[in-house]
Amino acid sequence: YMDYTNCRDSIHKSELSLPGGTLPLGAEVQQLVFNFNCTPLRDMYFVKLKVINKSLLVWDSTYISNMNDIDIGASSDDAVGCDSLKDISFTYNFYNSDNDYGTNPPAVGVRFLQSPLVHTGNNSDTAKLPYDTLIGYKVTGMSGFIRVIEGTCLGDLDEAPIAYNFMRGKDGCGNALINWVTGRPTTYVYSGNACSHSGWYDSSSGDRRGLANSGPFTMNSGDTQIVVLSYMITRDGGNNLQNVCALQSLSDSALKYYYNDFKTCVPIGIEPISSEIPQRYELLQNYPNPFNPMTKLRFSIPLSRGVAE
């Protein structure tokens, strides 16, 4: 399945909430949505965004953000979080029972498989892509995750300044966010361990929306940036919290397939063929040249079996 979308700027009103009411930037966004009909990738789909600066202006301090309003069954009992090391944001059911899913409701996550590239010129910086590893570049990754809730500074993205503040990893009023556990400024809300409910995690249920950000970077006129996201769902963990751990593991699998350019649809890894351990081995002298049609290859096996020539 593939879905192609070609987006371009058009004038929109400020009350259109999520766009933030900005004027046209001169951006072109080409979107490709795809998935694979095979077991390892059955619980995920992928979104590739190609963003082109078609204007004559330089976009300074640019961010690309992914806004999601995910409801795990009923919308009133969800929680959100993120893993800043894996570049993933997620939504899960706060309780292990849901009116729609019943027990063991799934977790849903979105991971940045590829984020905007920044040229540093430093040979120690590398950016891994499916087809190459770029020297002197780095990826911006998921630079922040924001939970959007009701309130003056934490509410919807109704205006451009509010939207941009959220994208920078601040609240809508431009204030730094504080990790409630460490007491230090952060751009990652609920970055604790949701599986074990340790660190800073979402400690109450409700209708949740989340904004995952990547930036800042500069786009000159004519520049192109590519972002690839994987959307995943799983209930393999066994309960609402452990499903978050299973989701993080599933996202690692998605990243491996992406780096392999989706060339194969078999599990990545080594599968044991046999549990038997050889007692010894012997390399016989197959002389003359084995490619000579007159050469006979000697071999032996420890069991008495018929062997077809």
Task: Locate each region found by the language model.
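Extended, loop-rich substrate-binding clefts of extracytoplasmic carbohydrate-active enzymes
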Residues: 1-48
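Terminal connector regions
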Residues: 44-46, 232-267
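Asparagine-centered strand-capping/turn motif at beta-strand->loop junctions
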Residues: 51-56, 233
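Glycine-rich (often Gly-Gly/Gly-Pro-rich) flexible segments and glycine-rich loop motifs
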Residues: 60-203
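Short, structured beta-strand/loop micro-motifs enriched in basic residues and often containing a Trp
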Residues: 202-211
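Short Pro-Gly-centered flexible turn/kink motifs
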Residues: 218-232
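Glycine-centered coil/turn sites that cap beta-strands in beta-rich domains
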Residues: 271-287, 291-309
